């Protein structure tokens, strides 16, 4: 009995130790190796197939600010806008031109994007809803000409002269004027005087933009976002020369049509196109760099933001991080991560704010860091973002924008300003000038929930708003009464929420395995400790009871014998009597 009890106690102790070793040493190592194997980018693996073509489309939601008082704004009144949306699109992503390095540690690729309208999720809204929005292309072109008038006029003067020289009658008249009159031509005057140059543009506005009576545009989401708003249609003379200069700028939101006209659209340049050549780390040599960008278009830096006075590239131009579609594994304890976004030509830091869950899967919540759209300037150590490309607008004395706004002029080749949706966290210098902004951190903040073992994004949203300054422009009569305003145009929510199939995949391949390993660990430890403690306890209890029985038995026997003798003596005495 003693030997059997001790054997069971020993087995229990061994089980407890085994459970501890398995749970805290063996299982973690095995899980670590399996996670690395599952997250590396190797051709032919399931992970590679999911990376090459996202197993589900992203949600691309667009909210458009409809202007309810356009004619009042033209008279200098405060603008009133109403958010209309979401207009929901499926965003499909497919890797093309995939090529691995010799050692397989890096992979080069481009990524095609395609947008398809999701009528069901957008209902009751449709792509053909009529809305009044800021005429972005006209406003942009006028501001660019205002800021660079002499340069612009000089460029298209030669185009106009060449055009006029091809017309025989004009050529003859021009020669006569040059011989008989010392007066300068209109084009020469335009070249010398900025104000007169703008007056020249003012005359041609109707031909270029189709007789606008406000700085706003009546359009549809389909036209404004993808199909394009036409302008520069059937233009001649100076208007044609101006349109040629617009075309030469190669602004990505403006494209040339077969008939020579131009079209502006917000996202047509993103549809059925790629956003450059990426080189990322496969994680084979260093799992901590899985999917980290090594090069974009063959470079490690941009030429968008200001560089250091020494000429060296600034931190603002540095390309690093992932593209946001995936992160390296083992995120537990990682306080910050970085995303590089080609849409806004910069990297963005996100910081750990706590834990969360998605469809029962534990996750880490990361949100945008305060320095993303915080104060900009030399005193904050980030003056490389102060490109000072939007003069005559509402800016600080050093030319930088106020808190919460970022000048994307160099990125868009147009005076576009980035904020968070509804100007969340934006300085009062901007928010006080417009009605209709209703910022809500939970709805308008950038965030992502990441599964900590694999680095898989479970749920998240990249939320940004695009704005433009609307202001008076000298010599452009249409803008005479405008008050300077940072005007909201659209905001987008580009996000991911894993579908049922992907949730099941993670649950089956990871969560259930981890749960099973936990059960095995704690069953071994629990049963082992129970046996190790219970068996000796049972043994000692039984032993104590056994000793107690042996001690009590002689006393009982003696008492019984004495009682018997007394009884016998009593009986004998009675008989004597």
From Swiss-Prot:
Topology with respect to the bilayer: Multi-pass membrane protein
Residue ranges, Extracellular side: 28-519
Domain of life from the UniProt record: Eukaryota
Coiled coil recorded as keyword: no
A GO term from the CC aspect: plasma membrane
Residue pairs linked by disulfide bridges in the UniProt entry: 316-384, 345-411, 386-400
TM region positions: 7-27, 520-540
One Gene Ontology molecular-function label: scavenger receptor activity
Subcellular location: Cell membrane
Record: glycosylation sites: 66, 161, 271, 307
Function description: Plays an olfactory role that is not restricted to pheromone sensitivity.
PANTHER family in alphabetical order: SCAVENGER RECEPTOR CLASS B TYPE-1 SR-B1, SENSORY NEURON MEMBRANE PROTEIN 2
Protein family membership: Belongs to the CD36 family.
Protein name stated in the entry: Sensory neuron membrane protein 2
Protein source organism: Anopheles gambiae (African malaria mosquito)
